[in-house]
Structure formats: structure tokens, C-alpha cells
Design a protein with these regions (language model features):
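Conserved catalytic core of sirtuin-type NAD+-dependent deacylases
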Residues: 1-243
């Protein structure tokens, strides 16, 4: 039995599936993976800032022009479309087996594919709020704000994306709900993540179910604990499963 058949068998016998995903889920939608060799972290920025520094709270407050220049160029992809991974997970949710998607990504491709139960650990690029009057801007309205720094049309204060920056804490309500669904799962599929970003990666420790599956292009710290490890692109793997 090959690994795809094994995965199909595990899915068939599971009733409470949770998918935990990272940047690798969206790379097949042409959104770069932060930590792959050709990802954002390896870009030559031509200045003395790392990518982590550029998307930190400190950079947002002290150098907002640099922050927003980097953010809009490398973290926001308004034309991206769901890929095979997003489509498969949406179809699996419709069967009633998939109870939740826990994602580290800030795009909304899971929702665009039709998924309803999505827990976004690092926030959403589709939500943007004025720091003064709290006016809401969706992604389109946010990108239409003129100038190197987006200022609110009502009060003139800075509009901040509702995403978790480096040096900021995660939304503990979302984190707690993610921990709960992972704890209740009988199958946890980890896909497209190197499991090195904390505290998000620590959520895996809440899993106590029957089967742990890892699907990733490179090895992860959880491989030795997994019941099944498949090396490859997640969309390609899911495309071989029964829809």
C-alpha cells in the first residue's frame, strides 16, 4: 500500500479531522513561503532589516513607510485564488468529517474555497482597522488608501492590518479554540508548515487522537511522532485523494 492509499484509509476511518496548515498550503496559489529557500526570508532587501524585523511591531511604529512598503509588496496578494489543497479541504468539510482548519496564514483562500470553520492564528489581511476611530477597511479599500502610509479617511489616523506582527501576542481566544478542536480530533493532518513558528506550533501538543499525519516539502520536528509522513506539495497530495 502506498502512502496516498494509507492517507485515504486513515481519512475514511476518521470522524473528527482537523487540518493544521502553514505557508506551504498557499504556495501553489503563488504566495511565497516565508521559510523556503526561495521565500521572503531569503530576499535581498538592500538594507539592514531582516524580513522578521520589517513585519514587527517596532517597525510598524518607528518606520511605518518601510513597514507598509514591505507588507503590501510581499504579504498581500489580492489576486490569489484557492488551489487544490483549499478545494479539497472545503469538500472534506462538506462531508462532516473535517471539523476545523487551523491556519497560520493571513490570506482568505480557505474561505474563498468554501470552508466555514477556519481559525486564523495570525489574523487576516482582509481585516484592517483605524487605530483612532476603529473604522473597518476590507483589503480592497485598504489598498486604495493613497500614500506610503494608509491613513483613515474619517479621522486621519493610521490604518493597521488585523494581523499578528512579530513582538505581538496571538489572539488568545482563537488560540484556545484551536487548542480545543485539536484536542478533540481523532486525526490531525499537518500540512505546509515547518512547525518552527511559536507559539502556533505548540498547538500540536494538544493532540491526543489516533492518527497524526504530516505532509510537507521538507522535514518537520513532528515527523518522528507521526503515523504517516508524506514529502511533497500538499495540493498535489490532496489531488490524488478521493474527492
Amino acid at each position: 500500500m502506498d502512502k496516498i492509499e494509507q492517507l485515504q484509509g486513515i481519512i475514511d476511518q476518521s470522524q473528527r479531522i482537523v487540518f493544521f496548515g502553514g505557508a506551504g498550503v498557499s504556495t501553489e496559489s503563488n504566495i511565497p513561503d516565508f521559510r523556503s529557500s526561495d521565500g521572503i526570508y531569503s530576499l535581498k532587501l538592500g538594507r539592514h532589516f531582516t524580513a522578521e524585523q520589517l513585519v514587527s511591531r517596532t517597525m510598524f511604529e518607528r518606520y511605518p513607510e518601510d513597514f507598509f512598503d514591505f507588507y503590501k509588496k510581499y504579504l498581500v496578494y489580492p489576486d490569489a485564488k484557492p488551489n487544490l489543497a483549499h478545494d479539497y479541504l472545503a469538500s472534506l468539510e462538506k462531508t462532516g468529517k473535517l471539523k476545523a482548519i487551523v491556519t497560520q496564514n493571513i490570506d482568505s483562500l480557505h474561505e474563498m474555497a468554501g470552508s466555514q470553520k477556519v481559525l486564523k492564528l495570525h489574523g487576516s489581511a482582509d481585516r484592517n482597522y483605524c487605530l483612532g476611530c476603529h473604522r473597518f477597511y476590507d483589503l480592497t479599500a485598504f489598498l486604495e488608501l493613497e500614500g506610503p502610509v494608509p491613513y483613515c479617511l474619517d479621522c486621519g489616523k493610521v490604518v493597521k492590518p488585523d494581523v499578528t506582527l512579530y513582538e505581538e501576542a496571538l489572539d488568545m481566544d482563537v488560540f484556545s479554540r484551536a487548542a480545543q478542536v485539536i484536542h478533540q480530533a481523532d486525526l490531525l493532518i499537518i500540512g505546509g508548515t515547518s512547525l518552527v513558528v511559536y507559539p502556533a506550533a505548540s498547538l500540536i501538543n494538544y493532540f491526543s487522537g489516533s492518527n497524526l499525519v504530516v505532509i510537507n516539502k521538507s522535514s518537520t520536528p513532528q515527523d518522528s511522532q507521526a503515523d504517516l509522513v508524506i514529502e511533497g506539495k500538499i495540493g498535489e497530495v490532496f489531488s490524488k485523494l478521493r474527492q
